[in-house]
Swiss-Prot record:
Lineage of origin: Bacteria, Pseudomonadati, Campylobacterota, Epsilonproteobacteria, Campylobacterales
Gene (UniProt): rpsP
Protein name, entry field: Small ribosomal subunit protein bS16
GO cellular component, one term: small ribosomal subunit
Protein's organism: Helicobacter pylori (strain HPAG1)
Family label: Belongs to the bacterial ribosomal protein bS16 family.
GO biological process, one term: translation
Length: 76
């Protein structure tokens, strides 16, 4: 199953997340199909960018979003 979720990048104690499309059986930071945005929780205000066109495409072909990505996509 294809899912849209966050992968963590950045340093220790300095998280930065990439919004990616991946297979649900992959590890959190394993390979991904496409990167469609990013999320920086440490910046003020929190920096969120998600490509809505690609998000809608992946949802139309059956990808499921994680709870966190659903909340972030409403804010972006």
């Amino acid at each position: 199953m294809t899912v849209i979720r966050l992968t963590r990048i950045g340093r220790k104690k300095k998280p930065f997340y990439r919004v990616v499309v991946t297979d649900s059986r992959k590890r959190r930071d394993g390979g991904w199909i496409e990167s469609i945005g990013y999320y920086n929780p440490l910046s003020e205000p929190k920096d969120i960018k998600i490509d809505k066109e690609r998000l809608n495409y992946w949802k139309s072909v059956g990808a499921k979003m994680s709870e966190r990505v659903e909340k972030l996509s409403q804010k972006a």
